[in-house]
């Protein structure tokens, strides 16, 4: 029987320190409805894994309010015209589908996610018509007289009045996910003349993702994930990404509950946490100055690796390409570097060191250290 009480130690995963949000070209710098998010570096393959999962969660998982039915004075069904109104009921229905309502169903709020009936009275007299040139447009803002809902597009025209009248209008608003046809919407207390609408609940309009190559130190075998998110304004792209991440985490937690060994990951070495002078003293050390087996020392010598700096800048896959360099030598070297608080594939760019100049830089730094010690 396996012992599940001890954690398993896994090699570190390269992870982004943060996700960068950028405005999309042509948006005027606004990120209210469109934004791109960049996450790098990610281990090879993780870009597509995360990108596809986030895209699906963004498209199907987010909730927002939408009008699911309406009733209006004198309207018996959706295939009729109304005297004094330019649009027939079919066009009014289409206009109501384009209404974008915004409200956060907070957990502690009185109504929460409950369906709400929003009633309004529209009164148009002769003076109103005269002021508008004979036709008065009734907008979404005119219909939201109660309920605490904001309108993303308050000037969206629902219908146009051409003669004095008074109308009683009731909108039924519900929260949901995705898209629901009128046939799938069931109203327990549906009114006799209440017309049920198709409802577009999802606030996300478009999601695309791209994966590019990026580098960590001298190793280019990593992913950069670029996620483009466009919403209709009921939530911002930043909110949409945060909400979808929580939805995925909720689903992944189901599988995490399996009674198996837990994994802990080695932490990446951060140069900022160490004194740079201390690190430089370690980097200029010769390979023969640390305690390695004869086999590992010979392997590094044959690869023309003379200093610790030349060793730690080398990506792990590249080391394994050298002749006679196997997993056993690799494991020994990694353990020794770990004791020194170093690791393979380190980014030494802040020291001005790259694969193309590491030898000469190590010699230069070694001479400076020796000169400093002599003067001291």
Swiss-Prot record:
GO terms in the biological process aspect are: DNA-templated transcription
Q: Where are the transmembrane segments?
A: none
Ranges where the record places region Alpha C-terminal domain (alpha-CTD): 276-376
Q: Does the keyword Transferase apply?
A: yes
Chemical reaction(s) catalysed: RNA(n) + a ribonucleoside 5'-triphosphate = RNA(n+1) + diphosphate
Q: Which SUPFAM superfamilies match?
A: C-terminal domain of RNA polymerase alpha subunit (SSF47789), Insert subdomain of RNA polymerase alpha subunit (SSF56553), RBP11-like subunits of RNA polymerase (SSF55257)
Give the matching SMART domains: RPOLD
Query: Which EC number(s) are documented for this chain?
Result: 2.7.7.6
Tell me one GO molecular function of this protein: DNA-directed RNA polymerase activity
Which branch of life, at top level?
A: Bacteria
Mind telling me which GO cellular component terms the entry cites? cytoplasm; DNA-directed RNA polymerase complex
* Region called Alpha N-terminal domain (alpha-NTD), residue ranges: 1-259
- Keyword terms: DNA-directed RNA polymerase, Nucleotidyltransferase, Transcription, Transferase
**Entry-linked InterPro entries:** DNA-dir_RNA_pol_insert, DNA-dir_RNA_pol_RpoA/D/Rpb3, DNA-dir_RpoA, RBP11-like, RNAP_asu_C, RNApol_insert_sf
Q: Which family does it belong to?
A: Belongs to the RNA polymerase alpha chain family.
The record ties this protein, via NCBIfam families, to:
PRK05182.1-2, PRK05182.2-3, PRK05182.2-5, rpoA
Its function? DNA-dependent RNA polymerase catalyzes the transcription of DNA into RNA using the four ribonucleoside triphosphates as substrates.
Could you give the domain comment from the record? The N-terminal domain is essential for RNAP assembly and basal transcription, whereas the C-terminal domain is involved in interaction with transcriptional regulators and with upstream promoter elements.
Q: How does the annotation summarize its subunit structure? A: Homodimer. The RNAP catalytic core consists of 2 alpha, 1 beta, 1 beta' and 1 omega subunit. When a sigma factor is associated with the core the holoenzyme is formed, which can initiate transcription.
What's the protein here called? DNA-directed RNA polymerase subunit alpha
């Amino acid at each position: 029987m396996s012992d599940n009480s001890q954690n398993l130690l896994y090699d570190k995963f390269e992870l982004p320190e943060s996700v960068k949000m950028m405005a999309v070209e042509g948006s005027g710098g606004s990120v209210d409805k469109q934004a791109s998010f960049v996450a790098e570096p990610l281990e090879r393959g993780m870009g597509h894994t995360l990108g596809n999962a986030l895209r699906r969660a963004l498209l199907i998982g987010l909730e927002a309010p939408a009008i699911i039915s309406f009733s209006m004075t004198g309207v018996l069904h959706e295939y009729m015209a109304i005297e004094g109104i330019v649009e027939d009921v079919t066009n009014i229905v289409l206009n109501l589908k384009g209404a974008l309502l915004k409200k956060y169903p907070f957990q502690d709020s009185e109504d929460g996610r409950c369906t709400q009936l929003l009633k309004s009275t529209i009164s148009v007299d002769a003076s109103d018509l005269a002021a508008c040139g004979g036709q008065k447009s009734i907008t979404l803002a005119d219909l939201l007289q109660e309920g605490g809902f904001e309108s993303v597009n308050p000037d969206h025209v629902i219908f146009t009045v051409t003669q004095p009248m008074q109308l009683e209008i009731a909108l039924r608003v519900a929260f949901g996910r995705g898209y629901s046809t009128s046939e799938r919407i069931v109203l327990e207390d549906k009114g006799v003349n209440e017309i049920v609408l198709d409802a577009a609940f999802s606030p996300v309009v478009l999601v695309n993702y791209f994966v590019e190559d990026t580098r960590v130190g001298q190793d280019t075998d990593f992913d950069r994930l670029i996620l483009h998110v466009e919403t209709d304004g009921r939530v911002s792209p930043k909110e949409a990404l945060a909400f979808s991440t929580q939805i995925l985490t909720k689903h992944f937690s189901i599988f995490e509950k399996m009674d198996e060994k837990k994994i802990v990951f080695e932490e990446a070495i951060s140069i900022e946490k160490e004194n740079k002078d201390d690190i430089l003293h370690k980097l200029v050390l010769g390979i023969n100055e640390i305690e390695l087996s004869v086999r590992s020392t010979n392997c590094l010598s044959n690869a023309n690796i003379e200093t610790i700096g030349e060793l730690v800048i080398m990506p792990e896959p590249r080391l394994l390409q050298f002749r006679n360099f196997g997993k056993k030598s690799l494991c020994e070297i990694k353990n020794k570097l770990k004791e020194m608080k170093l690791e393979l594939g380190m980014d030494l760019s802040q020291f001005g060191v790259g694969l193309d100049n590491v030898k000469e830089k190590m010699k230069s730094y070694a001479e400076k250290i020796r000169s400093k010690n002599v003067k001291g």
